[in-house]
Amino acid sequence: MKTTFLKACAVAALALTIAGSASAHRAWMLPSSFTLSGEGQWVTVDGAISNNLFYPNHVAMNLDSVTITGPDGAAVEAQNKASGKYRSVFDVALEKEGTYRISSGGDGYTASWEEAGERKRWRGNAEALKAEGIEAKPGVEVSRSVRRIETFVTLGAPNEAAFATKGTGLELKPITHPNDVYAGEEVSFQLLMDGAAAEGVEVEIIRGSDRYRNSEDGLKLTTNAEGILTFTPEEAGAYWLSAGSEGKGTLNGKEITVRSTYVVTFEALPL
């Protein structure tokens, strides 16, 4: 099955956020350190969906879809995984020098249709959608959701092997390395949609610890024709970036709605 975007139009933080709301539920992963040096290093990563950044107070993140890409592009295992009421946690052994991509998310389908006077709803993957005959139901409405939540950690000298993209949904292609961000200096990231530059995508950036501020003091930006956004973090700290888009696609020749969300957590260091 092949799903292709016919049109991508920006919307704020679909599925993972409710932009502009003080009680927004935001998904995030936060490592114990973003940059390290030396041998035998580990990081512990927290994952949650919360009202405040990075204060777990709503629900723990599901760790079933966590993947880690090492500095050589190979998969790295998440260790000591555990989930509590409000927060999930796992460890990553940094055995090789370079940059690690830590990611969670999914690619799934939902469907709804009328049957025998009742409204039916279904959720699953592309294979089950076909195998169960869901897409053949009369009047069925199908939507696809591609979501990613990521962070990056670097041991020693940074590299870019872990930045390789998959070509599906919204993805980050760093111009500024996410572990080389400093307060007061300009940062540039590129967003891709299905492997191509994602123009006109709305992005929200918020510094953590908003629980202790009277306002979020967030930035709202829109990617340019090359999918690039440029900003300057004014203060040091951990930041949360969220982007979302919605458009029409096709599945086996039928039009469907396609939504994609992307979240990344990064750190701005003091100069």
Model-derived features: where do they sit?
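Short acidic/polar inter-strand loop motif in beta-rich domains
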Residues: D107-E115, G247-N252
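Bacterial N-terminal signal peptides that target proteins for export
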Residues: M1-A10
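Short, aromatic- and glycine-rich surface loops/edge beta-strands on solvent-exposed regions
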Residues: G98-T110, A238-S245
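Sec/Tat signal peptide C-region and signal peptidase I cleavage site
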Residues: I18-A24
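Beta-strand-rich domain onsets/edges
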Residues: H25-V43, R123-S188, L192-A198, Y212-R213, ...
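Short amphipathic beta-strand segments in non-cytosolic proteins
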Residues: V66-A75, E202-K220
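Glycine-centered loop-to-beta-strand initiation motif
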Residues: G84-S88, D217-G237
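Short, ordered, surface-exposed loop/turn motifs in non-cytosolic proteins
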Residues: V59-M61, A196-S209
